[in-house]
């Protein structure tokens, strides 16, 4: 409905000089909503007012009492319509506010979050209010005419509203809450892929949620996409949004489309789930990247402490970036599979961080591990850079499902679509590239085909690659490798003084403290010992020589080693009092062993030839499976799709140099004449 959107957009002409261009939406959007609701309520307005007047002084639940009469999940009890407000120029401000206050609370909430009264006051101050009211009062946004024929359907109105949003985002410097339509089209195309029952069965009803709804773009495009294939299907839309104005836009968009506005909630999803008992057939989101979750930390940690009963049981990412928490939230909201039926699917946009951030055992790695172990990860699509309005970084579409078909179980499909776009004629913020319909269709085909792809278009240069992996491919074990501590021992004056000043020394029993002090005093300050056993024997002998009968205990000997030892790679491996070789924390290393590979075989092949004195720390085990080596996960697109390009041959390089030299000499001769 571009024509309808253009008609409404023309009203912005009245705002020039009074408002900045990026402020137009504060006027145009709420007035569009106001006029649409005014029009659709017109046929039942008088009946609603009669019922309201009869009970207005009684304690009635007006929502339950009046919505059946209005025919919508909202109503208006005021005596004003927008054309009626336009009839009284002197009272336009007060009458308009009275009209707004006459709406049911769910609609007033939208205008409140828009800050609409403040906008009305500014319009009045700039002498634009009456002109704007008059212009919108003349705009026909009726759903049906007097004969019952459609004028502007909910679908038409929704498309027009979306077109207006797109126009406003084109002139806005921000656009953070707006996911580009081409990205959404790809997301919902893949999300619905294979669900023939949804796309073809008349009367089918499904639910869809977005926990970071923004202006509702993902939800509205999903509904439109579904209706292209099945206009008799119903997709019930749910969303939650933190920012007040974007929440108001989203709720208004859903209202205009005939959705239940109660399904759009305002608030931080991480802090509180506003749809606590609702699960979804589909979910899609573009959560913020690199935004810390500190404001919701208390609530998140309480949820995590609930274990499986909470939303964040698998793990918590670093406080600096909460995007993986939104994925966990969505996983907790998937429609469960019951006796092979039901289940849910998720599409979510992430940057590169959730693919590989976090070491083995860390929060991010544990979240990936949980998703992979439960076989929820279906596919990840790498998108081109420069696809979003507010960032040019690489982004990825994750597709998650608890109802994977048999042929996809235990498998993960990676699609490299970073070469599948074309440059836009005009940049929108940082967005320089977009998906064409052909790009989307080809990526969706690669998803549906579920097999290796290596495609290149000779004319455009666009490329598409895909590979199928076993889910275990993305697991590894972090095995700790130790090497011996090698020290020489010498009782220098400085070392002895430091030993005697240590609090641990002063806390030794009197007999042991005196024995240690006497023994180190008897040592030759110039003597150097490169073997720990020899040094301990000398120390014990010195104590005995001083008349101390009781052998020095483990604690004094440990203190002596701490202060009288200096690292020396030429010394023998240092042992403790039990004869066990001590490891050197400074030489400690880790090897990342592919999951399933025998760690001893790996050690013999990759470590022992380089460090013959090294050994595996078998006390470093995974908390879950109890085996040596902590389990970690990562999904490295660069490695999986890396293509080795051999260096040019010496002959080729030599020929190029000779060619350049010849050109240079020809140029010199030309200059010399």
Language-model segments: residues:
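Active-site catalytic pocket residues across diverse enzymes, especially alpha/beta-hydrolases
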Residues: 41, 226, 230, 334
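Conserved Class I SAM-dependent methyltransferase catalytic core
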Residues: 7-8, 14, 20-36, 187, ...
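Short acidic (Asp/Glu) and glycine-rich catalytic loops that position anionic groups and cofactors
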Residues: 166, 260-264, 304-310, 345-354, ...
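Conserved S-adenosyl-L-methionine
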Residues: 176-285, 289-302, 324, 351-353, ...
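Short, contiguous acidic/charged loop-to-helix segments that flank catalytic cores in large enzymes
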Residues: 18, 294-303, 308-322, 353-363, ...
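Feature representing long, continuous alpha-helical segments
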Residues: 220, 248, 285-287, 324-332, ...
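Non-catalytic, mostly N-terminal accessory regions of nucleic-acid modification and defense proteins
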Residues: 1-196, 263-271, 382-385, 409-416, ...
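Flexible, glycine-/basic-rich loop-and-beta segments that form/coincide
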Residues: 389-494
């Amino acid at each position: 409905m571009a024509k309808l959107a253009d008609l409404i957009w023309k009203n912005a002409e009245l705002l020039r000089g009074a408002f900045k261009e990026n402020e137009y939406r504060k006027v145009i959007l709420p007035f569009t909503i106001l006029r649409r609701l005014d029009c659709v309520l017109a046929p039942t307005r008088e009946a609603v007012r009669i019922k309201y007047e009869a009970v207005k002084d009684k304690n009635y639940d007006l929502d339950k009492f009046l919505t059946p009469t209005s025919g919508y999940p909202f109503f208006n009890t005021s005596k004003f319509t927008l054309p009626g407000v336009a009839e009284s120029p002197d009272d336009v401000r007060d009458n308009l506010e009275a009209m707004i206050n006459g709406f049911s609370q769910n609609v007033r909430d939208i205008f409140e979050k828009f800050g609409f009264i403040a906008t009305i006051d500014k319009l009045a101050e700039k002498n634009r209010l009456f002109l704007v009211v008059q212009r919108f009062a003349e705009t026909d946004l009726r759903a049906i005419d007097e004969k019952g024929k459609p004028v502007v359907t909910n679908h038409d109105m929704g498309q027009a509203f979306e077109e207006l949003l797109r126009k406003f985002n084109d002139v806005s410097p921000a656009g953070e809450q707006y996911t580009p339509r081409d990205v959404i089209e790809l997301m919902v195309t893949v999300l619905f892929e294979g669900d023939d029952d949804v796309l073809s069965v008349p009367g089918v009803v499904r639910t869809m949620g977005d926990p970071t709804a923004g202006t509702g773009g993902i939800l509205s495009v999903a509904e439109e996409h579904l209706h292209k294939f099945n206009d008799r299907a119903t997709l019930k839309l749910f969303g939650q949004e933190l920012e007040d104005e974007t929440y108001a836009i989203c709720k208004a968009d859903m209202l205009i489309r005939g959705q239940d506005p109660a399904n759009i909630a305002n608030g931080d999803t991480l802090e509180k789930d506003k749809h606590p008992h609702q699960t979804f057939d589909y979910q899609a989101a573009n959560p913020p990247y690199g935004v810390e979750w500190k404001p919701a930390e208390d609530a998140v940690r309480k949820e995590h402490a609930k274990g499986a009963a909470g939303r964040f049981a698998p793990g918590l990412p670093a406080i600096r970036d909460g995007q993986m928490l939104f994925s966990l939230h969505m996983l907790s909201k998937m429609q469960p599979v019951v006796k092979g039926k039901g289940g849910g699917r998720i599409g979510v946009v992430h940057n590169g961080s959730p693919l590989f951030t976090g070491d083995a055992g860390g929060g991010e790695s544990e979240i990936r591990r949980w998703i992979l172990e439960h076989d929820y990860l279906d596919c990840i699509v790498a998108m081109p850079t420069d696809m979003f309005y507010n960032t040019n970084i690489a982004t990825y579409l994750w597709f998650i499902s608890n109802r994977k078909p048999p042929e996809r179980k235990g498998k993960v499909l990676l699609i490299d679509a970073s070469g599948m776009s074309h440059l836009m004629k005009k940049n929108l913020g940082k967005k320089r590239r977009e998906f064409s319909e052909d790009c989307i269709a080809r990526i969706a085909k690669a998803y549906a085909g579920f097999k290796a792809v290596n495609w290149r278009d000779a004319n455009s240069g666009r490329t598409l690659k895909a590979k199928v992996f076993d889910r275990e491919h993305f697991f590894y074990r972090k095995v700790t490798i130790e090497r011996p501590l090698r020290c020489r021992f010498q009782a220098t004056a400085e070392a002895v003084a430091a030993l005697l000043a240590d609090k641990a020394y002063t806390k030794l029993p009197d007999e042991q403290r005196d024995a240690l002090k006497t023994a180190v005093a008897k040592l030759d300050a110039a003597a150097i010992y490169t073997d720990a056993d020899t040094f301990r024997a000398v120390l014990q002998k010195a104590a005995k020589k001083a008349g101390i009968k009781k052998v020095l205990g483990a604690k004094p000997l440990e203190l002596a080693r701490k202060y009288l030892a200096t690292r020396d790679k030429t010394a023998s491996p240092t042992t403790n009092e039990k004869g066990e070789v001590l490891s050197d924390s400074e030489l400690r290393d880790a090897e990342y062993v592919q999951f399933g590979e025998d760690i001893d075989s790996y050690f013999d092949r990759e470590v022992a030839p380089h460090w013959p004195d090294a050994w595996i720390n078998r006390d470093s085990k995974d908390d879950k499976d109890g085996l040596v080596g902590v389990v970690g996960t990562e999904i490295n697109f660069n490695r999986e799709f890396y293509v080795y390009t051999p260096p040019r041959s010496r002959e080729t390089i030599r020929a190029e140099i000779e060619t350049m030299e010849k050109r240079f000499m020809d140029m010199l001769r030309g200059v010399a004449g």
